[in-house]
Amino acid sequence: MIQFVLAAPASGSGKTTLTCALLAALKKRGFGPCAFKSGPDYIDPMFHRSALRVDSHNLDLFFSAPDTVRALYAHYAAGHDAALCEGAMGFYDGLNCTTAASAWALADTLGLPVLLVVQPKGASVTLAAQINGLKNFRTPSHLAGLLLNDCSPRLHQLLAPLLERETGLPVLGYLPHLPDAVVESRHLGLKTAEEVSGLQEKIERLAEAVSATLDWERLLALTSLPAPVSPLPDFLTPASPTVRIAVAKDEAFCFTYAETLDALRAAGAELVFFSPLHDTALPEGIGGVYLPGGYPELHAKALRENEPLRCALCAAIQRGLPTVAECGGFLYLGQSLEDADGTAYPMAGVLPGQGFRVGKLVRFGYAALTPQADSMLFRRGEALPVHEFHHWDTTANGDAFTARKADGRSWPCGFANEHFYAGFPHLYWAGTSLPRRFVTAARSYLQKEPNP
């Protein structure tokens, strides 16, 4: 089975572009690849699934213990003959200026070779020195080969012998400069696949390029490993559905971890998707609703105009419908929300607070979320790893939890009670008690409210 981590010295080196190119090229060569993303980024896996029709999941050593990460990797790689893990940030960049939860830590946990993406513009021998620094910084480094990004054929011809001689690592090829294949991004990362003009043509262009410029024989030989084997964890063991849970899914609410949805199914949930933008009523017979993050700020006017759905949701929550709202879903439940132009629109009005644009990342990064009291999902004093990633804030963040970063900074946040959780932190449900608790609350609600 072909398996490797794609990493780089720093963000902006072209990992995501090369990931798309390699996945598409592997498909053209007859492989059935899957993809993984190191860290908490839900946007790239969503892009892999939508644009490339490739199964893609997150592997995060802050969210999950090493054994859980190995189990997730083995489970989601099963049935595929190639697995590509895209690293986040720089190769060794992890939690709080350590290597913890870094791309290197993931490669070390899974025992995978690493292909390093480097941009050679403006350097030659110095590039070899930088690569050797990465190669020797930790033992083992797992570095197995080099890929040159945004590189001309002539420069590749000059640099490849130098880099191989000075670093001992094979140069497996290059991706040329392709301005016509750029995938656009916005304030939280890549645009969704549906929004990128000419996306399939761009992906085809990338695949054709690396099909011609990579040494596939050497690449496949270096990355061919036995398929991973790990016992299927309980939190992914299939279960018969016992309750219907509605999950918001549309252009405004699209930031979900696929592993979270699978963990809910394994806990007994039948997931029913609906659109706060386009549907006028909640799905029938549900015992709970999950409002994930996304881009509600880009669709605030349309969300305001769908008053029937907003009213139905508000009434259901007031009746005690078990509800989880993360980040964008949390903003949707507030009193109002500004769009990108600063125009405020009424929202569901379940919670206090006006959502507003800040213009930069707010409280960005990992944190530990500790509840002040027992609630539907949480138990007092039970810390849970979370992640915040948003450019909008609200005038009422709540105080049911304390969020604390590794450097000691902390702040109050979130709303919670016996049937409710809402807040900016994104939760990673797989391997936790959250799915079982949510499903239990949903079943209990339906028993008390037979015709919700």
Identify what each model region corresponds to.
Residues 241-307, 311-318:
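Phosphate-binding active sites in nucleotide-utilizing proteins
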